[in-house]
Amino acid sequence: MLSTLQPPRSLSLLPLRRFQISKTIVSAASSKTIDTSVISPPQSQILTTRRSLLSGETTAVEIAKSYLSRIRLTEPQLKCFLHVSENVLKDAQEIDQRIAKGEELGPLAGVLIGVKDNICTQGMPSTAASRILEHYRPPFDATAVKKIKELGGIVVGKTNMDEFGMGSTTEASAFQVTANPWDLSRVPGGSSGGSAAAVAARQCMVSLGSDTGGSVRQPASFCGVVGLKPTYGRVSRFGLMAYASSLDVIGCFGSTVADAGMLLHAISGYDRFDSTSSKQDVPEFQSQFLSVDHFESKPLNGVKVGIIRETLEDGVDSGVRSATQEAASHLEALGCILTEVSLPSFSLGLPAYYVIASSESSSNLSRYDGVRYGNQVMAEELNKLYECSRGEGFGGEVKMRILMGTYALSAGYYDAYYKRAQQVRTLIRKDFKAALEQNDILISPAAPSAAYKIGEKKDDPLAMYAGDIMTVNVNLAGLPAMVLPCGLVEGGPSGLPVGLQMIGAAFDEEKLLKVGHIFEQTLKGSSFVPPLLANVA
């Protein structure tokens, strides 16, 4: 039961000391980089679908059937989805009927979209991969989902995740463990592992995830897809089950930068149901996605790119470091001006993040008491009902983070933990502001290693937490960031993907998308297809 657990021993390691990446946490990949020059640049699934529908080459129903068939073939191995919608073919048929009538189609018409299970979908299970919400079916759509549907998008199903977004491997799901399409013995990352793996396995065209400390970007790196975390406030959080409200954002996955960018455009904008959503204008991101034929010899001439020094120091796998350096060289060849930048407070970000996120989660998850929210376990006394409902409803990782947060917020430790963590957050924001005043974007690895084995770090939470060191600072600063594949390292049947993280100034996703699209379309080997799909139509 939750009330009988003691504060975890790891709390003694949480004071805001500088965090060094341990060399022992990196074991997935070797230093050799694999040549992928035989692979051609990727094509946008959204644009291809639209062209096929408008030309009459295919129908929305035929497209939907092909994706549902692929789900049936690959899902027993991957376990990306917790629920597949029964309305996919019906929704596709409605799009075909609109085409037959000559009606105008929305930009996402016929696009099959996976939705992370902590994002509410009307009438469909939305459990946050937790037993405490096992049978919950929301009576409303999250704003992001509502916008997708209004533009013709089809929700294909709800994707697996770490319970309430608390984890980096998707092993903390209460229902199943998702496998990485590149190597079924490895994790897809987390907490949005199901959304990333589903896009990588072409079970859906694009998907929604949530990113509190890297939960879109790290699995994008592990699965070889594009993961886009918008600026805090760019996308409404209405209908997103809260983990850490000052950090949570809804993000996008796609097999290309264009797909992720067009999905972001669809869900962005002010929402009166979310007071933290911004009234900033949403640019026409689609203008960035030109054909490769239009690129000049140096299409990024003069773009200033800062390489974050601290992200390439000891503790980063040598293969990841090499892939990042090669990606930087490619940017330079495209005309970028490279400089090395330092974020002095970088190493403080990880402990500060876990104090803040755990503190906010202990407050947010207090609503799940078996009375107001969540499955109820009957007991003779009210306190016992709370204890039993939460004790049986929450998994171990969630309980540990609730305890960490409650401990950090307690009267005797508030100043030592939570207050200091917020002070560090201010320093991190200042570091990024200074770096981005001198550079258009910053780059770093997305994670210290490629995907590791399922179960490898399950019993060592500190090692797992350390893997978030590349991503958490961006959430603390509220900035946009995108991860896209930049190479393969040895491991698995045909190599393991690693991602390059690009970080931009607040509300400047447009620049990230421009640089990322040109990088992707001109990089040899940028079409990353996992071996699982070799024999799947």
UniProtKB/Swiss-Prot annotation:
InterPro entries: Amidase, Amidase_CS, Amidase_dom, AS_sf, GatA. It comes from the Eukaryota. Its main location: mitochondrion. GO terms for biological process: glutaminyl-tRNAGln biosynthesis via transamidation; mitochondrial translation. SUPFAM superfamilies: Amidase signature (AS) enzymes. It is found in: Mitochondrion; Plastid, Chloroplast stroma. GO terms for molecular function: ATP binding; glutaminyl-tRNA synthase (glutamine-hydrolyzing) activity; hydrolase activity, acting on carbon-nitrogen (but not peptide) bonds, in linear amides. Coiled coil: none annotated. The keyword Transferase does not apply. It catalyses: L-glutamyl-tRNA(Gln) + L-glutamine + ATP + H2O = L-glutaminyl-tRNA(Gln) + L-glutamate + ADP + phosphate + H(+). GO terms for cellular component: chloroplast; chloroplast stroma; glutamyl-tRNA(Gln) amidotransferase complex; mitochondrion. The active site is at 116 (charge relay system), 191 (charge relay system), 215 (acyl-ester intermediate). Its EC number is 6.3.5.7. Keywords: ATP-binding, Chloroplast, Ligase, Mitochondrion, Nucleotide-binding, Plastid, Protein biosynthesis. NCBIfam families: gatA. Subunit of the heterotrimeric GatCAB amidotransferase (AdT) complex, composed of A, B and C subunits. This protein may be expected to contain an N-terminal transit peptide but none has been predicted. HAMAP family: GatA. This is Glutamyl-tRNA(Gln) amidotransferase subunit A, chloroplastic/mitochondrial. It comes from Arabidopsis thaliana (Mouse-ear cress). The lineage of its organism: Eukaryota, Viridiplantae, Streptophyta, Embryophyta, Tracheophyta.
